[in-house]
Curated annotation (Swiss-Prot):
Belongs to the bacterial solute-binding protein 1 family. WtpA subfamily. InterPro entries: ABC_trnspt_W-bd_WtpA (IPR022498), ModA/WtpA (IPR050682). The gene is wtpA. This is Molybdate/tungstate-binding protein WtpA. Part of the ABC transporter complex WtpABC involved in molybdate/tungstate import. Binds tungstate and molybdate.
Length: 342
């Protein structure tokens, strides 16, 4: 009996050890992997939807999203040394200019947008403003408007580009001067048929705060308009729709939306404080996986979701046009079946 009891105890001990081992394995399987996605502020709502869809497919993954202006988003990796698994920006060329070749080596272009002028129902002169008189409304002394910081956010330099292009479209050389130059130290200069604005460093930007407000990211202007501190702000159409704003659709010649006007858009350039020159072009968003991504396989799956038909439908539902088919600037073996290489 004594020997038999010992055998039973040994078997029980073995079973307990096996159970603990299996429990440990199970625990490891269920431990959340954190997939870090740094993205442009204007992608905040789409990223919430991508996060939900991805986590449903990958229950052991927690997608951590973090919004900022696109240039600021990239600087988190290139200057601050932070780790991200996916980077998504509102201007695909920023990835190429700021991350190649050290931090990334490919970009997929996946979505489009356009610049609009958004406002509340009770913004000053909301009942008068339209696509032909908007700049006259903004000139009025009791009207305040805003845009994001061009050094941090593509929406900022695109807003300034749109205002400068308005001078050409409306044949009025005073529009930018009256709206921006008169109220800040931001000025375009003409150079061989092109118009160039050289940005001071962010801490040296000077503005008349009774007329203009600037924030690092376009999304930070939303509450200023909602609270009545601002009457109007330049923003992407998708963001205006997502947040229920009224908006003036600017003429296609100045809203940076159409490839048909790429040559016209290219007449305006902004040199950022870091020395990078940005040329006016149709708005196209970009996505990449940094070279030092810690969860590369999952990052590839996340990018696949964004550029898939499901991802394209998510964008459409949120008022943003996907680029169909998505285009890559170089062959990406793990994604080649889903993109065109241009």
């Amino acid at each position: 009996m004594h020997i038999g009891g010992g055998v039973v105890k040994i078997r029980i001990l073995i079973l307990l050890m096996l159970a603990l081992f299996l429990l440990g394995c199970s625990s490891n399987v269920n431990t959340n992997v954190k997939l870090k996605v740094f993205h442009a502020g204007s992608l905040t709502e789409p990223m919430k939807a991508f996060k939900r869809a991805f986590e449903e497919k990958h229950p052991n993954v927690e997608v951590q999203t973090e919004a900022a202006g696109s240039a600021a988003t990239i600087r988190k990796v290139t200057e601050l040394g932070r780790k991200a698994d996916v980077i998504a920006t509102a201007d695909y060329t920023l990835i190429q200019k700021m991350m190649y070749p050290e931090f990334a080596n490919w970009t997929i272009m996946f979505a489009k947008n356009q610049i609009v002028l958004a406002y509340r129902n009770d913004s000053r002169y909301a009942d008068e403003i339209n696509s032909q008189n908007w700049y006259e409304i903004l000139k009025r002394p009791d009207v305040r408007f805003g845009f994001s910081n061009p050094n941090d956010d593509p929406c900022g330099y695109r807003s300034l580009m749109a205002i400068q292009l308005a001078e050409l479209y409306y044949n009025d050389p005073t529009i930018f001067d009256e709206l921006v130059a008169k109220n800040s130290n931001l000025r375009f200069s003409e150079d061989n048929g092109s118009y160039v604005l050289r940005m001071p460093s962010s801490e040296r930007i000077e503005i008349n705060k009774s007329k203009i407000m600037i924030r690092s990211m376009e999304m930070e202007l939303i509450h200023l308009v909602e609270s009545g501190e601002l009457d109007y702000f330049f923003i992407y159409k998708s963001v205006a729709k997502q947040h229920g704003f009224n908006f003036v659709e600017l003429p296609v010649e100045i809203d940076l939306s159409s490839p048909d006007y790429a040559e016209l858009y290219s007449k305006v350039k902004v040199v950022l404080a870091n020395g990078k020159e940005v040329t006016g072009k149709p708005i196209v968003y970009g996505i990449t996986i940094p070279k030092n991504a810690e969860n590369r396989e999952l990052a590839v799956e996340f990018v696949k979701l964004v550029i898939s038909e499901e991802g394209q439908e998510i964008l459409r539902e949120l008022g943003q046009e996907p680029l169909v088919p998505p285009r890559a600037d170089t062959a990406v073996p793990s994604l080649k079946a889903m993109v065109e290489v241009s």
